[in-house]
Amino acid sequence: AEVIGADYAYLLFEFPPQQLPQAVAGLKALGAAGFNVTMPYKQAIMEYLDEIDAEARLLNAVNTVRIDENGRLYGSNTDYFGFRQSLKDAGVPVEGRRVTVLGAGAVSGPVWLTLSEERAGHVTWLNRTLDRAEACAAQMNRRSAGIADAALLTRENLNRQIRESDLI
């Protein structure tokens, strides 16, 4: 906040998942301008929000909540905007490219959405557990049919993808 001249503090609050409603009420009562959430709260927070942006709704995950002057809560997913902008800032073209994604964890949603919107040619998800990689590929294929596949993250699969991919 100091860097941009804003009078805000960024504080860490830890609480058990069952106390999420009280945490949200407490932040509103304190007059907080907003807050961030991480796992395991990215889906759970959604039921307490007054409005959710289209990308967060599509991803079924919110990580940033803004509280307006009337106490209304607005949710968004800044992982999506951050990943998309980092590709643009780096001048990395995605359209038509063969892409390999290593991992299928918590930020895989913003990755698959960005790669779909930027019209990647083909995306291979490599992960230590095949079911998570397949779930990411399935999400992409529901949005852009036939664009994605999945494989276990093994040395052999990784070496093949390094040779065959334009972007990793």
Regions of interest found by a model, annotated:
Residues 2-90:
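Phosphate/diphosphate ligand-binding glycine-rich loop within oxidoreductases
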